[in-house]
Amino acid sequence: GDGLPDGEVRDVYRELDPGSAVTLALRARGRVLGAMSVYRARGRQLMDIWDQETLSEVADRVALALDSAALQEQERRMAEDLQRSLLTAPPEPDHAEIAVRYVPAVRAAQVGGDWYDAFLQPDGATVVAIGDVVGHDTVAAAAMGQLRSLLRGIAYSTSGGPAHVLGDLDRAIEGLQVHALATAAVARFEQTSEERGRGETRLRWSSAGHPPLMVLAPDGGVQVLATERADLMLGVHPTAARKEQVLPLPWGSTVLLYTDGLVEGPGLPLDDGVARLAGLLGELGDRPLAELCDQLVARMRPGGSEDDVALVAVRLHPEDRPRPPEAGPTIVPRVLPPVG
């Protein structure tokens, strides 16, 4: 016991007072990961060669298990780093305040495919997207990064509406052989001069099998934007027609996009979760936007979620007056001059 460190280990060793011991190195892939010591009480037969061979096999298995666990943790962290690097802060245009939240699953070993994005198209419209790739591993995280980048590139380069963007994305998934299934919703906030004069912003949205958007009106009423027929997920049928819905919204409205981890789980069917979220949105709707997002997550998932949760909230403001103090400053990309 002289080689043991001071503290609890040495105290336990003295209490057990073993008569013999064998210490074996834990090796895996040419690296020493640690050591395993086995003790036998005084008065018992000393360990023989057979005991040592058995213990050597046990040590090999322990080392492999430790090495596998370390590799899985490294893989999980890499996927999580990739995921978080893509979930960037949103822009803050004059006409809208945008708040985003991402909460990983409570089971640390899982990395999901939830993602969100918000950006301005060249014509000044604001696009908000959210999605969920099927799976909870590095493959799902990598596919999430591909789909998010593809959607952003398509929406920015074409200035297309949500249905057009989702249709092009579905065809890109097929043509580029991105092996993924995913749900997604895309919302575009746009204004004409006439709409601006009426104090309205037009919401144009399309869904690919994603949970329905919600709208909180300035008077506190909540509208769940469910479609009559569920749209196909991405990656199922690349030539499927995508539907687009349009809704004029008065300034002061709040639009909520979220993934199913917020509204579905053990003991909480999806429809019940959507109804509960709509009730909470109406109850908490007068809160500042960042606080609203935090409260919705805390109230819907007080003990955490077994699935990732992504949430995007957009609150519309007039363009002809300063942004409210709680909305923070305007932050938008620099406008580049046209090429040529």
Outline where the language-model segments fall.
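Signal-transducing coupling segments at domain and membrane junctions
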Residues: 1-19, 172, 237
